[in-house]
Amino acid sequence: MAVSLPTKYPLRPITNIPKSHRPSLLRVRVTCSVTTTKPQPNREKLLVEQRTVNLPLSNDQSLQSTKPRPNREKLVVEQRLASPPLSNDPTLKSTWTHRLWVAAGCTTLFVSLAKSVIGGFDSHLCLEPALAGYAGYILADLGSGVYHWAIDNYGDESTPVVGTQIEAFQGHHKWPWTITRRQFANNLHALAQVITFTVLPLDLAFNDPVFHGFVCTFAFCILFSQQFHAWAHGTKSKLPPLVVALQDMGLLVSRRQHAEHHRAPYNNNYCIVSGAWNNVLDESKVFEALEMVFYFQLGVRPRSWSEPNSDWIEETEISNNQA
């Protein structure tokens, strides 16, 4: 008697496919850099971002496992350009336009100082202009911190008026050592323009010595804040002894204090004149409160809330010199 084929060899659903045979793509974050002996102004970096992608499986229930499956990940490659300035980069050099703007800013400061000193002697006022100057010094440090926090956390290079400064400060987080390579006028000319257009009308409109005591000191600290910032990135052996002494006394922001700003989570020590306000602002969480207000009122998240990415992670000067 013949046995039918289906009866002798019954068909069964496949239920024991090993997990290793199931399709799964793994995607990780990889940073690759290529160095050569020739200068390359536009070095490309390969950035790989990690994302979770659910791959579709067959609807056949016989192919489904009752055990929970781990998230499958996919490899996606995103290419970006990264070009840290070289030590001899022309963008770090001062031009005559830069020097003229710094000279104009310093001239407006000198006029304001002269009006304060001469007006104080003529009015027999010495203490009041001095106290006003001290107030200007203290508030300049606060102002530098608020502005630094704002451009670190909000806006981008397309932001009107301050877009270039936002882009520059983001680059500064990635290559902080470049500020020590900038020439004096190159580092100060942008602030010198602001000071010139702000202080010049005040010089022409007011003669009060107390008022100018505040204006000249506040404007001086704002104009030279970027130089104080550069000194905070310098090494002690290469700084003028007077600068080191002022840093040690707390009159200028110290190297150790500002170094904390360039460490994760990158959300503290924003003030760059004397740094006197840093502890007050950080311990009272003023900036965190402002960030919450902006988020709930405007729906805007600050950059400090995100995990540090390649735009925040510092690259050393050594890797730049090898490129």
Swiss-Prot record:
Name this polypeptide is given: Fatty acid desaturase 4, chloroplastic
Domain notes: The histidine box domains are involved in binding the catalytic metal ions.
Renumbered ranges of motif Histidine box-2: 229-233
Protein species of origin: Arabidopsis thaliana
A molecular function GO annotation: palmitoyl-[glycerolipid] 3-(E)-desaturase activity
Lineage of origin: Eukaryota, Viridiplantae, Streptophyta, Embryophyta, Tracheophyta
Topology class, membrane: Multi-pass membrane protein
Family: Belongs to the fatty acid desaturase CarF family.
GO CC annotation: chloroplast; chloroplast membrane
